[in-house]
Each structure stands twice: as structure tokens, then as C-alpha cells.
Amino acid sequence: MKTEILNSQNEEDFEKAVSILKNGGILAFPTETVFGIGADMNNESAVRRIYEIKERNFSKPLSLHVASLDVAKPYIKNVPDDAYILEKNYLPGPLMMIFDKTDLVPNYVTANLHKVGIRVPSNDIFQEIANRFDGIIVATSANKSGAFPASSLEQVLKSLDGSIEAVFDNDSVITGLASTVLDLTTRPYRVIRSGFITGEDISELLEKQVLLSDDGDISGTIKQLSKLNIIVVEGTRDNVLNKIKELYEKYSKEHEDKVGVLLADGSEEKTGILKHTKFLGSVNELDHMVESFFACVRAFENEKMDIVIVEGISREDRGWAVMDRICSYASEVISV
């Protein structure tokens, strides 16, 4: 099977996308964070294909991707008033809220859990698909489990070409920074995964305590699909950069110069110009730093590096979400 590329400027291609979903196919589409792959919630064989295509453990649930929270109402229950405050401020956008599910959500979607995640992407292409499709799309990120998420059409095709029916092109900016996942079934509410919207943002908006959790952590899973040893160094800036120089000198000798370094803009003034250095970008542009991380690591893979040493940034404000994302792919995190 050859994966078809759909044109977001072509009206007929949206109808084709809806037809694919109705007939049990798998469709890849952009969101404001990364590309996703989705299927019709009520087609069990199509949903199971998502797991098989991604090589995803069946114990991990999928989420419902909808055009608005209102569409999701028949599928969720015990919805707190706070959900509508969050909807007003953040949706559509990079926030997934977890609710108790109704019996209308099949157990094969939620891995037999009584909860379900609801995501309302703001991307215009997704919104158009969801509004035309008369069912519910269940989805997850468009990549093999444990691999870097896809933030471009080319990355989707590199990973999934031939295993899905179609993928939409995309002209919108995709950050690579994951959506925030907030569990509204617990008291206090719990941030399962940090993203563009921080726990502090949510706590301030709702005027109540919100806990942070590492339940969504996937540390080390990238090692299943990559030979890269990713080491993140975090702490005070001078200590971090001194440690990076130390590690670079050590590992360059041990690995015959197959060591890459990832620094924030300007840090080379402290470390000096180390061979195989790439840059994450400015700490003042955190929204683009995660995507820079993915792009640079992919480049290091192509250059046959063994080790990549990454400069950690401050975890203040949205820096927490950036570090949470980067560290989830690290084989080692060193605090100095």
C-alpha cells in the first residue's frame, strides 16, 4: 500500500479523508503540536491497526480527538465545572483533559480503563476533518512507539509510509512541544504530562492546587529505536557548561570523536567551539526549542554519532515542559 498525500487546499481531499475513516482506514493529520494518526472509534479493527502500526503496547490507551468539548459530552461523565473554565481559556488548543468515560467509549480504546482523554486540536486541517466526519476520531502521535514524534509531512512518511492510507500536508507551525495532559478525575487535579500550558497556569486560572505527576514519563524508550546515548545536563548554567566540556573531552576519546553537543544559543561563549556542536535556539523562544531538539538529534543520528550531550535549561515557567519533553528521551540526566 502506498500512503496518499492529501492536499489541504483541495475540497475533494477532505471528503476522501472522511471516506477513509468511515471505511476503516488510518489517517495522519497535523495538530498544533505534532502529527497524529487516527481512526473511527467504533471500528475495532481500525483502532487495533493503530497499535500494530505504532508497535504500541495495548495497555496504553488512546484518546478522543474532537472538534469541541461539546462533541465529547456523550462520552464523558462527572465533568467538573472547572473543565468549562479550562475550555473557555485553552480550547481548541494543546490541552488534553482526562474524564471518567461513559459506556459509549469502547474498552479497546481505553485499554479497559474507566477514564478517557479528550483532545481538541486547534489546527484548521484537523478541525475541518472532525467537523465533516460524523463519528469520533481516536488518535495518538504519528510515530513508532518510543521514537521522536513527527512534526512534518516528511517525518510521517519516513516512519509510516505504506502502513497508513493517507496523510494531510500542513502549512501551520508545529512546535513539537507536547500537549499538556490534565487528569480531572483526581482530587487535587493532576498534570500527567507537562506541555505548553503549565501546571502553574492551570492552578492560577482555577485558583486551586494542581499536582504534577511523572506518570507520563517515557524515559529511555528512545533507546529501543536509536543507538544514540542522549545525556542531559541540568543545574546552574556555569556548572552545566563546565560539566558538558568535561563529558565531551572524556567521551570523545572513548568514542573516536562520535560525540555531539546540543547547546542553547550563546553557550558556546563559555564552552568554546566544540566539534559537532548544534544549537537548540534561544531560551527566549521556548516554543521552538523542542522541535530544534528533535531536528538536531535526527541530524546526529544521520551523522552516526554515538553520544549526544544536551544542555538543560531552567525549569522555570514553560521551561519545565521543555525539559520534561527533552528528558523523556534521555538515557541519563545529570544534575550539577
Residue ranges and their predicted role:
Residues 1-336:
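Active-site-adjacent structural elements in enzyme catalytic cores
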